[in-house]
Amino acid sequence: MSRKSIGEKRHSFSMRKLSVGLVSVTVSSFFLMSQGIQSVSADNMESPIHYKYMTEGKLTDEEKSLLVEALPQLAEESDDTYYLVYRSQQFLPNTGFNPTVGTFLFTAGLSLLVLLVSKRENGKKRLVHFLLLTSMGVQLLPASAFGLTSQILSAYNSQLSIGVGEHLPEPLKIEGYQYIGYIKTKKQDNTELSRTVDGKYSAQRDSQPNSTKTSDVVHSADLEWNQGQGKVSLQGEASGDDGLSEKSSIAADNLSSNDSFASQVEQNPDHKGESVVRPTVPEQGNPVSATTVQSAEEEVLATTNDRPEYKLPLETKGTQEPGHEGEAAVREDLPVYTKPLETKGTQGPGHEGEAAVREEEPAYTEPLATKGTQEPGHEGKATVREETLEYTEPVATKGTQEPEHEGEAAVEEELPALEVTTRNRTEIQNIPYTTEEIQDPTLLKNRRKIERQGQAGTRTIQYEDYIVNGNVVETKEVSRTEVAPVNEVVKVGTLVKVKPTVEITNLTKVENKKSITVSYNLIDTTSAYVSAKTQVFHGDKLVKEVDIENPAKEQVISGLDYYTPYTVKTHLTYNLGENNEENTETSTQDFQLEYKKIEIKDIDSVELYGKENDRYRRYLSLSEAPTDTAKYFVKVKSDRFKEMYLPVKSITENTDGTYKVTVAVDQLVEEGTDGYKDDYTFTVAKSKAEQPGVYTSFKQLVTAMQSNLSGVYTLASDMTADEVSLGDKQTSYLTGAFTGSLIGSDGTKSYAIYDLKKPLFDTLNGATVRDLDIKTVSADSKENVAALAKAANSANINNVAVEGKISGAKSVAGLVASATNTVIENSSFTGKLIANHQDSNKNDTGGIVGNITGNSSRVNKVRVDALISTNARNNNQTAGGIVGRLENGALISNSVATGEIRNGQGYSRVGGIVGSTWQNGRVNNVVSNVDVGDGYVITGDQYAAADVKNASTSVDNRKADRFATKLSKDQIDAKVADYGITVTLDDTGQDLKRNLREVDYTRLNKAEAERKVAYSNIEKLMPFYNKDLVVHYGNKVATTDKLYTTELLDVVPMKDDEVVTDINNKKNSINKVMLHFKDNTVEYLDVTFKENFINSQVIEYNVTGKEYIFTPEAFVSDYTAITNNVLSDLQNVTLNSEATKKVLGAANDAALDNLYLDRQFEEVKANIAEHLRKVLAMDKSINTTGDGVVEYVSEKIKNNKEAFMLGLTYMNRWYDINYGKMNTKDLSTYKFDFNGNNETSTLDTIVALGNSGLDNLRASNTVGLYANKLASVKGEDSVFDFVEAYRKLFLPNKTNNEWFKENTKAYIVEMKSDIAEVREKQESPTADRKYSLGVYDRISAPSWGHKSMLLPLLTLPEESVYISSNMSTLAFGSYERYRDSVDGVILSGDALRTYVRNRVDIAAKRHRDHYDIWYNLLDSASKEKLFRSVIVYDGFNVKDETGRTYWARLTDKNIGSIKEFFGPVGKWYEYNSSAGAYANGSLTHFVLDRLLDAYGTSVYTHEMVHNSDSAIYFEGNGRREGLGAELYALGLLQSVDSVNSHILALNTLYKAEKDDLNRLHTYNPVERFDSDEALQSYMHGSYDVMYTLDAMEAKAILAQNNDVKKKWFRKIENYYVRDTRHNKDTHAGNKVRPLTDEEVANLTSLNSLIDNDIINRRSYDDSREYKRNGYYTISMFSPVYAALSNSKGAPGDIMFRKIAYELLAEKGYHKGFLPYVSNQYGAEAFASGSKTFSSWHGRDVALVTDDLVFKKVFNGEYSSWADFKKAMFKQRIDKQDNLKPITIQYELGNPNSTKEVTITTAAQMQQLINEAAAKDITNIDRATSHTPASWVHLLKQKIYNAYLRTTDDFRNSIYK
């Protein structure tokens, strides 16, 4: 029985209702149907686009209005169909055949078009479908089928899969057609265009209630229908007048593979997106019937078609079409179904599109009968089956009706009676089961699932057959039994799947693990979700893809990079019923991992410290985990960063027995196996138990050894000497002589002793030490010091390796300070040795041993790599790379040394292997690659007999070592390998090595190898942050930035030009940073304060114009806790206290004046809180959050408070140096890492300075202290290198001298020569600065002996010192010496400075002129010798503020120049009341005389004669043997002290007016003495006048009586020096005496005066023996007529001076003067046997006599010296009548008269002299004893002056 649901529409079709055509045609069409419907194309992840091609002629006017005349552009998500319209361009000739007409006629002949009209309840009819019946088949078409379609071009139709946003392809080029545009339909609103019967279009939307639905075909067994009948159930159409949908379909499951039938399924809105499930049809053996469910209004009978039985199960295949997601796909081709078809109807409302569910009906037990069709009047209605009564009659067989007897009863013929027999039989029948369908909302729509398997029942019937003639004529049922069937229960799916969505609801960055956690919201109402993947993109690149195991759980994506912009997307896989489909969800999220934490990136060592017995000490191991870690902290050391002090959070025991120490600082992390983790942890070993003779504790070891010095002791663990506290006077850990054995290995493992502060042993006596490492030594002592022992006798040391720093005031060595008959083998030292001795006592410094002696001593197979500093200054002090002093048969063999030796004193007894082998030291098979500076690469002793063999080097040194063979590096390496040295430091400390780490930024993700330098520099700019951040900022450094190419040494925060060290107090004022590069340049970057980091102890600054940041390398703190602890202690320290003197090593009553720190000490103490903050900020990265750190640092300062104050004061006093606007005091005092030395501690260095002792801290030792204490931490070898390095950085465009001169407060005059060639040299000095007048260049020269001047000059607080520099001298003087009274006022302040400056300028010019003259006189070799630096001190005879003159001592604090310069320099000398000045050959000291006075300048030339005569003025010939130094100065080469002086000497200083009537010397000496020829010309002219006047005076006196002669003249004679060794007279002295009457009687002529050795009484003594080497002068106008000589040796003082000038005038400087005054002929004299014993030299020397000189100079020209002199007088007397006239101001008797007298003749001149002599005779005693009283003397001066003026200083002759 058929049921119809309420509102259900049914379409019934009946062949009888077709009003046009033949039934046969209609029927046959079902078998021949071949017209295909457009196939369903697959949906995919991309946008499906349909291209449908059609001709323009098919468009209506309305359609043409929708035409877009353009090409399709970009694909949009809403696109559906493009109708591509073409215009035909082909016009074929008319052949009488019209294809359209032909097609129509052909189609009309083979087809029948049936219009299906729907009748509505309101009586209206509408066209529903076209039923096209053809001979090839049937096609049910919707009314809209003829809309936008064209069969002409349909072959080109296509479906495209185009990504949204991609370009659509251009339409095809079709031959004969022109593309003109397109019409587009969209799918976003599911609107479809349909053309109604009247040609109008209407839009239909799925969302509207009247939208058209298509039908699903469902197969089921139905016992209600007879075999061969079928039922087609189609979902009815909703009511409404809307146009027909373009999409329409009918069921196609009954089509064969040859009867392709396409069906489109339109989905219920309630199930849109769900997959349609096509049930699998089981194999059926029974016919299948099709049932049509009809509506009340529209019924059409349908026919059934018999098909062969289908053997295979049915299932739904195919992809989905747009708009039908979730529906079952229509399979286009199916195999031929061979069974009858049964079509189930569709379900009622709410179940559209679903398989019909048949209600369960009772089993049908009656016979089946086939009903015919309905009778007229019942068309379209179901056949009514009348109830049939039970048949009780015998069964009769009816035949089939014959033709033309249809409907008539069959004619039964009568048959004869037959015999009837019976037969019993049993018939078993199957009772078919029924199928019950249950809707399952969890099962995909149209899918079926057998919930319960059906089972057929059985019916057993017993029959009795009646047989007649062998035929059964009747059968009678005897019995019947039944087994009921089990009904089959089938679940039918109603689920229509929709595409699930996965939305990212949350993204959490887990930055420490480089990962993210993503949370999702999966919306999957229909369980279509299959899987999903999280995809991470960097730009367009997929970098990470992770399967989402459970969308409900958080998804972790790891392995990401920091500072990379990422996008996270979700790639979804789902299934809507058929195949898996994929797409990328629209829910995305951008993110970037940014990680900024504090990380300790590089660790060389990590040390645990804790408090024990009221002191902090280091722990190498722990016996248990402490419960309270407040008193513990950690030191982290690195060569790349400052040492860090960090608090301990916890200490716990690990499972392996070690202890885990956790360091906690806010934001501190370390990298683990899966990313970063909080805090930093390291391990500490567990302490081992002690065993007899085996030790694991240093304290127990020392205690045991001290109790038994002859025992055997073995180490079983690494240990630290920090366990033991030493007494103040303790110089070693063990006292006494150790005779036992110390073994550093237990046989399986070697161990080390750490942290020695003193030598382990005092003495090793026959002891053995082997297999031991001694590490991190930090020993300092005022006694002999070494790591292992102070002394060793007959000891054996093997396989001992030492590493650390050792310093001392006496002998210093790596292993043993002093050894005798000791063997040291296979051992090594690595580190620093500092010998800071300040005296001249014996000491030796060596890398292995200081001094080793004895034939049994051997140093074999040792290695040294060390920096050694020494103050070796004499033969008692040595330094060597391996041994300082090697003597008495001791041997060094098979050993190698590398490193550097710095000798602050420049003494050369320093060697790369050994300082000295004197005597009998032996060296064999050694290699030295040591930079020895002023020493030698192998041995400091270079005597040829030294026993040094097979010594090699591959480096170059300043000095050539006679024993060194130069080899290549490869050769050196091979030689060292052959030595077989196996000692190593690497075999111990394994537990500590586990805590080491290093970073290589180039190995990190996103790092670029070529940016290695940039990463290193960014590390400097932000040292605390994690390495990934370093790489991130490093990648932002421009390739043009210097940070990209050049390595940084340090970064210094600044405020303008001020270095900022107190960062906490000035953090907001920091506005730039200084970048110090390794190429010795600096650059500056502007910065602005950005913020405090999360850990507020780290602060950040933005760098202007850059993408990176800056953070100072300091945990910013005000250090309140520490300062509160120590401030009062520091403020109570006094400089002169006993405690301070104890630290200095000075006696309680010792004065500390020579420190010159008084003023600065008080200034530092007054501001100690600020200084302390600077020290702590720059010292280490001190984190003050831990109590242990605060207490440790506080105790360290308090325990060393005196040393701390001394060191801090010292640095503030001597390093307060300016470089233009830049003051470097803070940089020098606190920034010890400025040169990249990150291992240096500011606090430790300052304390070490204070502890270095009084001698080291003396102001005069600033150069030595730098070399010993600061060079290694500052990175420059000398203090000069240090200040020059700063100059190069901060004033690169200035020279050292320019900077020095600008920044010292001393008044400096550098007087360059007026000689062009000299000035050129001085202005362009050579590399050795030989010609430079720059004060800095000169005091920094290697030859300068007063280098301690540097820092006092640079730090002078005021102008109180002057410096005058010229070609040969460097003069220093104090302003206080010239505090004169001017106009009754004692000069001070600016007036004094102006006064002194003026005098300095004048004196400097005079000194310059003096040396210019000498430069002009000398040969080229001697000229070069003038370029030197002889120090001149102006003395300490100063005046105080009251004008009182006194000799100041260096402790005088009232004289600024003493306190600030002369005192600190340490250059002082005692007062000498009898000395104006003195010299010693290399310096000049003024005492009574003042350098800047006019007379003082003359004295200056006097002293410089002493410093220059022998080697320079005498051109290397030396002084003539037998003549003292003073003969060469006063009265010979010393400049006159005035141009008015009557002394026979040269004016080399003063300039005067040319027409000065009083001058007696040249008015411009530089111009006049511009060559030796000019000098001779001048002197010859001078002697022309003097000889003439002397002859006239002789004539005037010889005319007098003998009494006058006797008073006027004196006789000069020789006395002799007796050579007692050779028993002979040698050198002469002069004496004068009065004449006897007999002698006077012989004086009758000029020649008689010469022959009788007569001199004038005037200007000489009446009677005197002139001591040799005296201060004498010769008067130009008091004649010496004598020609006295000495044939036995050198002449006396008077005659020497007189004859020297006469030779200068006659023969010149080189041909007359030098041969006479110098030892030019000494070699010749000595060779000839003329010699004498010199007590000065202690040997025989040449005896150069006057006779030899005379012979050599005159070469036979004269017969004697007297003959020479007579000739000189005669030469002038012969020309006197040719004298040029002169005019003088002269009036006898009136000395001040201006009366002019013109002298025109010699006679007139003679007359004037006669008159003057007569005047003197009247007052003869006075006139001859007091030169100014002599009128002759005055007249001669006036005549001489007149000729001097008229001849232009004798440039012209006095003769006509």
Curated annotation (Swiss-Prot):
Motif LPXTG sorting signal, residue numbers: 92-96
Compartments in which it is found: Secreted, Cell wall; Membrane
Positions of the UniProt region annotated as Disordered: 254-362
GO biological process, one term: proteolysis
UniProt main location, coarse: secreted
Extracellular compartment segments: 153-1856
Compositionally biased intervals (Polar residues): 254-267, 286-295
Domain G5: 417-496
EC class of the enzyme, as a word: hydrolase
Superkingdom as given in the UniProt entry: Bacteria
Cofactor note: Binds 1 zinc ion per subunit.
Sequence positions bearing Pentaglycyl murein peptidoglycan amidated threonine: 95
Chain intervals with Basic and acidic residues compositional bias: 322-334, 351-361
GO cellular component: extracellular region; membrane
Primary role: Zinc metalloproteinase that specifically cleaves human matrix metalloproteinase 9 (MMP-9), leading to its activation. May play a role in pneumococcal virulence and pathogenicity in the lung.
UniProt name for this protein: Zinc metalloprotease ZmpC
Gene assigned in the entry: zmpC
